[in-house]
């Protein structure tokens, strides 16, 4: 690095007699800074490629396995080339996380379609209260490298903040947890990605279900406004899928309605899943993504160039 900086410095010094004023070069640099926004091409979201016979094969290209080492800890959903949404309670301490995309297998074989990308940065929502009383249970993961879009890796759409899903809307929940009908205390995670058809439930009814065995006073709601419930009363997914997507098809596009936040007594079929309602956080998510895009690569070379341009003119 020192050698390259020396060469750059020498090159800059040699270029001074060319007559290019510092003011002009500084203006060019500022224009580049204001105009460059990284890769401006955005992949189409929420439009997965599926075979005609969905009974034989269905894949969810935004599905993410969040990992610590080789261990799957939570699910997540790809929403942009370098951004994943998951539940905030999935993040613990200062562990080094990575994500796997492009596969339905918990332990994928070596394949060109499977992506393993380290997590560069984690942004927790400021209203997250913690694992005891969950609120603001959403986190953003910024990846070190952008994903390579294929039919196996595609982002899901973020819903507009004012969009409201009607009670009874059909959605899908996916993850590597066991389905409730096959749940047991000794269950391990499923080797293949599981899916379950669910329906949006009224928050008040959802709150009543969970309140029956709760000692919390009735004046304190368990299911808050930033949560959304879904179930089909027959089959749902169990623990191991926290942070996983609740995906709903709306006008031909799939949107991320929620990420799995919590549920109680997985073996009891009538207990719905409670998800973080993404519409409540769409603006925050978009703001973080826009703030996270560096307008210019902040390298030593750029800093040295800027420093050189701002130096007082030496000589005649």
Curated annotation (Swiss-Prot):
E.C. numbers: 3.4.21.-
UniProt record, GO biological process: proteolysis
Molecular function via GO: serine-type endopeptidase activity
EC top class named in words: hydrolase
Active-site residues annotated for this sequence: 89 (charge relay system), 137 (charge relay system), 242 (charge relay system)
Signal peptide feature range: 1-38
Keyword Glycoprotein attributed: yes
Peptidase S1 domain residues: 49-290
Subcellular localization, as worded in the UniProt entry: Secreted
Example of a GO cellular component annotation carried by this entry: extracellular space
Chief location bin: secreted
Residues bearing attached sugar chains per UniProt: 110, 162, 186
InterPro entries associated with the record: Peptidase_S1_PA, Peptidase_S1_PA_chymotrypsin, Peptidase_S1A, Ser/Thr_Proteases_Immune/Dev, Trypsin_dom, TRYPSIN_HIS
Disulphide bond pairs: 74-90, 171-248, 206-229, 238-266
Keywords: Disulfide bond, Glycoprotein, Hydrolase, Protease, Secreted, Serine protease, Signal
The keyword Hydrolase is annotated on this UniProt entry: yes
UniProt similarity note: Belongs to the peptidase S1 family.
Protein name stated in the entry: Serine protease 45
Protein's organism: Bos taurus
Gene: PRSS45
